[in-house]
């Protein structure tokens, strides 16, 4: 009920010009912000070494006290054509767009929900069935709970859904198979719960697929149109989009991902599977095949400059410049740890205990929150140190280490940099050793 009381205290606001004036990002130097430049140079050399031994590319941006103090790119946005190394790779720049993977959950779906809740159009205790007609238990369900499932259950990843039903893969999904957005919603409704809602936290893409559909139900717009017109455009963001190739971007502006489509170097097969190098299309299978590239759980592309503004909006308490998206009470509600698991906020992952060290390192404050993405992305927002870090990369743009043993382990994923906390710790160490 604590979250409900917090919600009731929110003031309805609109994403329009507000009387509030929020900090905007400016450029500064690491020295002026209190960083040890030699420690940052050591980090630079370490990242370069990781790229030299096979990590595809990295973009890193650091904000301290409302100032961008570090921004750099390493490696190649595309260096493979299929399994063959290119003679002339496409170099990564600080403007390169990356497939955000599950960071979509935060910077599209959560931002939309935070705005809608701040406006009083949604409540965390609303039942899913209020917005998704036909969402209910069936007589044959072994585990019931859909009838009373709430938005907050999905945000907490405690709704009972399996982690990944693999809807586009008929051999795995069986009767839940779908490669059509409308049909996918029906398959989600039929997806059996695996545990009693509210009894534990199991991270699930299905939760955010449903939340994306709820945003569309409330706004009457496709998810991509709503966030692009009502969130990104007011903030002046021009490089944060779903389906970038359909919206004026060229492949050369985007980091490539998997070498041989979604086949994991030839060991995965299902109807319509892509087999050529993924370049400008979302990697995630459910987002691409089952949702047309636009889903609440994956599909968003962006660069570090745009993500910096979105992270600063969170740090500011819901606004940027003259634009207010939501208020500080909403930010607090979404980033407060669950009573059952201190690492889960409402969607946001929180640095609540040592299990989050691979994401946030060992030096970030316990109040730090953010998210990761399967393609090699991490965002870190630390309100105590007033610092944010975004690292974008294209980790799957390398061969699979052993397709037969583990088709989801890429060679690049075995490098230390694939554990984001290593990079995060080096940033904090540079700040703490002036």
Curated annotation (Swiss-Prot):
Gene Ontology MF, one: serine-type D-Ala-D-Ala carboxypeptidase activity
GO cellular component: plasma membrane
Biological process per Gene Ontology, one example term: proteolysis
Disruption phenotype: Not essential for cell growth.
Family per similarity comment: Belongs to the peptidase S12 family. YfeW subfamily.
NCBIfam families the record matches: PRK03642.1
Full protein name: Putative D-alanyl-D-alanine carboxypeptidase
The species this protein was found in: Escherichia coli (strain K12)
């Amino acid at each position: 009920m604590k979250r409900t009381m917090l919600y009731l205290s929110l003031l309805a606001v609109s994403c329009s010009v507000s009387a509030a004036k929020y900090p905007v990002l400016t450029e500064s130097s690491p020295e002026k912000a209190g960083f040890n430049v030699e420690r940052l140079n050591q980090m630079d050399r370490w990242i370069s070494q990781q790229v030299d031994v096979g990590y595809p590319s990295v973009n890193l941006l650091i904000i301290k006290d409302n100032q961008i103090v570090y921004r750099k790119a390493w490696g190649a946005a595309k260096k493979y054509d299929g399994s063959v190394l290119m003679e002339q790779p496409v170099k990564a720049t600080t403007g390169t767009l990356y497939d955000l993977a599950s960071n979509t959950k935060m910077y599209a779906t959560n931002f939309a929900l935070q705005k809608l809740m701040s406006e009083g159009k949604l409540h965390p205790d609303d039942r899913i069935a209020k917005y998704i007609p036909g969402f209910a238990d069936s007589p044959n369900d072994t585990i019931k709970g859909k009838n009373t499932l709430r938005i907050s259950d999905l945000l907490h990843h405690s709704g009972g859904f399996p982690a990944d039903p693999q809807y586009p893969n008929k051999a795995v999904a069986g009767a839940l198979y779908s490669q059509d957005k409308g049909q996918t919603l029906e398959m989600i409704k039929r997806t059996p719960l695996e545990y009693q809602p509210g009894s534990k936290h199991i991270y699930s893409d299905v939760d955010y697929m449903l939340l994306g559909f709820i945003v569309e139900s409330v706004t009457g717009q496709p998810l991509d149109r709503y966030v692009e017109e009502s969130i990104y455009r007011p903030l002046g963001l021009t490089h944060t989009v779903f389906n970038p190739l359909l919206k004026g971007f060229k492949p050369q502006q985007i980091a490539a991902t998997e070498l041989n489509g979604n086949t994991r170097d030839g060991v995965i097969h299902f109807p319509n599977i892509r087999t050529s190098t993924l370049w400008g299309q979302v990697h995630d299978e459910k987002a691409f095949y089952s949702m047309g590239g636009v889903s609440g759980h994956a599909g968003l592309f962006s660069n570090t400059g745009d993500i910096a503004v979105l992270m600063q909006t969170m740090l500011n308490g819901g606004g940027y410049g003259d634009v207010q998206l939501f208020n500080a009470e909403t930010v607090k509600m979404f980033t407060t740890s669950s009573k059952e698991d201190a690492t889960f906020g409402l969607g946001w992952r929180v640095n609540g205990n040592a299990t989050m060290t691979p994401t946030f390192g060992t030096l970030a404050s316990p109040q730090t929150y953010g998210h990761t993405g399967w393609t090699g992305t991490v965002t870190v927002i630390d309100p105590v140190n007033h610092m944010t870090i975004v690292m974008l990369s294209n980790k799957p743009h390398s061969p699979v280490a052993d397709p037969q043993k583990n088709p989801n382990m890429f060679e690049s994923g075995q490098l230390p940099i694939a554990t984001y906390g290593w990079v995060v710790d080096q940033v904090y160490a540079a700040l703490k050793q002036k």
